[in-house]
Amino acid sequence: NVNIMLCDIDCDREVTLTENASGKEFVKAMEGWAAITNNIFVWDYGINFDNYLAPFPNFHILQDNIRLFKKNHATMHFSQIAGSRGGDFAELRAYLVSKLMWNPEANVDSLMQHFLHGYYGEAAPYLYQYIKVMEGALIGSGQRLWIYDSPVSHKYGMLKPQLIRRYNQLFD
């Protein structure tokens, strides 16, 4: 009759929970609880609370993290991914997380393409490129992605002037 609620609020988001120091502490706690209960509730975060509209390219980690939750007996999962005012691709993020909760083995790229085409129509290929370029820039920069982040912290990485020009080209 007891739920164990674990929150990964202090974890970075540019790589999966198993790939960063802050995430490893969370995983250790989750694995410890999973050894003694099958009743774990995970409260996960996927948006920048200080800057809701700032880019938050973490789509590439969603599946591995959700698989990890399932493997460790998370029977409940709350993914705080958008506020009442929306957020960076809030609808896409909600769609992907929801689909992955039902089927952690689903093809994320297919799900993303399906949603983008249905929601954005002819703009879908450009938005897909934008997402992929930004994810690559984040990973390549080596900078952390955090839920209380300033876009200024990414001015030499995913938001550097050359990439802003590239993003604008995709939107034109």
Language-model segments: what does each one mean?
Residues 1-4:
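Active-site region of glycoside hydrolase catalytic domains
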Residues 6, 12, 22-123, 129:
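Structured mid-domain segments that build the active-site/substrate or prosthetic-cofactor binding neighborhood
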Residues 13-17:
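Short, charged, surface-exposed secondary-structure boundary motifs
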Residues 73, 99-172:
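Catalytic domains of carbohydrate-active enzymes that cleave complex glycans
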